[in-house]
Amino acid sequence: MLSLLDSVSLPYLILSACLSVILLRRFLAHDKGGSKSIAQGCLPEPRLRQWDPIFGFGIVISQARALRGHRYLEWLRDLHASMPHTKTFSANYGGYRWIFSIEPEILKAVYATNFQNFGVEPIRQHPPGFQPFAHKGVSTSDGDDWSFSRTLIKPFFERSVYVSTDRIKPFADKFMTLLPDDGETFDIQPLLQRWFLDITSEFIFGRSQDSMTHADRAEVTWAMADVLRGGRQRAQTHRILWAFNWDWWFEAVEKVHGFLNPYIRSTLKELEERQQRIKDGLPVDEERTDLLWSMATMLPDEEELRSQVCLIFVPNNDTTSMFIGHCLYFLARHSNAWKRLRDEVDAVGDAPITFEMLRNMKYLNGILNESMKPKPLSSKLTLALTTLCTPAHRLIPNNVTQVRAALSDVVLPLGGGPNGKAPLDVRKGDIVSVTKTVMYRDPDQWGPDANEYRPERWDGMRGGWHFLPYGGGPRRCPAQMMVQNESAYMLFRLAQKYSTIVARDPEPFRARMRIGPSSMHGVKIAFYK
């Protein structure tokens, strides 16, 4: 026996062992369904044809190349287009069974009906993809850890906070002073990012970064963008991290931590000193009201607090500014839509801009829901397609896919059988990924004009599981109304000031994936009063 082993090379033994483990796991997984799934009418789902059906590394590598080549949207569209006779199918993804779907009922099951059966820890926390950037937080945890993270932030997203337009006004006023003269071409995306960095830093840390006055203070924004871009790539290629050079990502993480650490350390020190003064019976100043202070009172550990703050501040610093940029990108290419928005704004007159007013403006909210659409998609372009708390709207949602891991065996209402209409047996460890942008362009849900930008389609339309901009069920984004209020306010102010918006970018839309898709070429426009 020993002589036989001596004649076999070590790499061959390792390869054979890996192959045996994967085959055994796949056999055991397919053997677990048993009589229970049969009794519920479950049928096998259609499976993607793969050149590497055993290890499933082919699809992992092709996705990694798409992300690095800024073709992720195209990759997702082509993936679903390759299975035209079903809305749900599976693939072997690095040895795991991934179930891809555009069925609203499956999204409903994952979000709400079977919420307890699905989680995010196996895909966002247990693999090393996000570390050392962050570990536990509202978007990476399940169970009690998730409930605690939600408790940390929930008070700051109550109605009394998100309805305020007074909080937005001074930052919008400053933003308006930075816009160039009539007819001058400029990229509005960096200005939007500086605006949102300032308003967010005041909300979270109690003092604004003031990057609209001091542009150099916005450098951390670019580091955060790299963290998000790399985080997505690492999360989706965590089984082959060794195949890539991640030095650039670790440098970005170090810059972001270097930005946050002084805020966190000074807050913890101030909190400790305040508590000591209270204990000694000494007078104290009025207590701070920012989010970081509130979180520190419940979580006074520096490393754990930083993880929680990272997963709130960094992803959400990118989303609202990117979302508004998407809306303007499209409005600059559709003059009639801008005119209709102007007419709605003019009809309000000089009335104060309030949350209730913005919520009742039908066309403005139609623009927010419909979001942005680039040039018409060719046969090779994706229907477009991330996950933390992000504004995900119809044509190019920031939340591109909704991915969950099965924490226990469960039966989904659809997905089985050759056309995906029978119940589907999902086993513990399987991954369910709902591709929102393909679902948001599905003619069966939206009609023959599903690929067209029509804000008016939302007039009288009721919501449903086929369109969930901010998620649903217990994990619904707590910042939904705040994002809507901030975005609506900024579009209102711009339409109030400028009669015309013109596109000045000859490049077709190409998405760079961060927390969601952003235009590689920015949003180059010109305004006219």
Curated annotation (Swiss-Prot):
Its EC number is 1.-.-.-. Disruption phenotype: Fails to produce tenellin, and leads to the accumulation of 11-hydropretellenin A, 12-hydropretellenin A, 13-hydropretellenin A, 14-hydropretellenin A, 12-oxopretellenin A and prototellinin D. GO terms for molecular function: heme binding; iron ion binding; monooxygenase activity; oxidoreductase activity, acting on paired donors, with incorporation or reduction of molecular oxygen. Its main location: membrane. It is a single-pass membrane protein. The keyword Membrane applies. It is an enzyme of class 1 (oxidoreductase). GO terms for cellular component: membrane. The keyword DNA-binding does not apply. The chain crosses the membrane at residues 8-24. It is found in: Membrane. Its cofactor is heme. Heme binds at C477. Pathway: Secondary metabolite biosynthesis. It holds the Pfam family p450. Induction: Expression is positively regulated by the cluster-specific transcription factor tenR and is induced during cocultures with the natural competitor fungus Metarhizium robertsii. Cytochrome P450 monooxygenase; part of the gene cluster that mediates the biosynthesis of tenellin-type 2-pyridones, iron-chelating compounds involved in iron stress tolerance, competition with the natural competitor fungus Metarhizium robertsii and insect hosts infection. TenA catalyzes an oxidative ring expansion of pretenellin A and 14-hydropretellenin A to form the 2-pyridone core, leading to the production of pretenellin B and pyridovericin, respectively. Belongs to the cytochrome P450 family. This is Cytochrome P450 monooxygenase tenA.
